[in-house]
Amino acid sequence: TTIPYGLDCSGFVLWCYIQLGADKTETIEKIGVGTWNQWDKSAEIKKSDVRTGDLAFINKYPGSDGNHVGICVGFLKNGEPLIAHCSATQNKVVVSTCGSEFKYFRRPCSVLTAN
């Protein structure tokens, strides 16, 4: 898929859900537009409870000026979540382990229906 103007991190999360067949309007409403909105529309979970499709954030809200979000796309053999996210510094989508970056894990509060 070619996106003429690119995506930010929260837009990439929405795009992932839509590519899996979720309704666009419902996804925007239930997942949220913008990193902080996606934080607000999700519930905190432990790293050990992360499932594919859960969200990973770098900063905690409130209390920080900025944030970054990615989506869990799988796991290493040791159970470490793999997070896909738009990297501004690399100017592309990358898949990273949580490492020291992604510290906060959340699950969207609403279940999406497929088209």
Kindly give the residue locations of the regions a language model identified.
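Catalytic cysteine-centered active-site loop
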Residues: 1-52
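Short consensus segments that form the blades of beta-propeller domains
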Residues: 2-3, 61-63
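Aromatic- and glycine-rich peptidoglycan recognition patches
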Residues: 28-46, 62-115
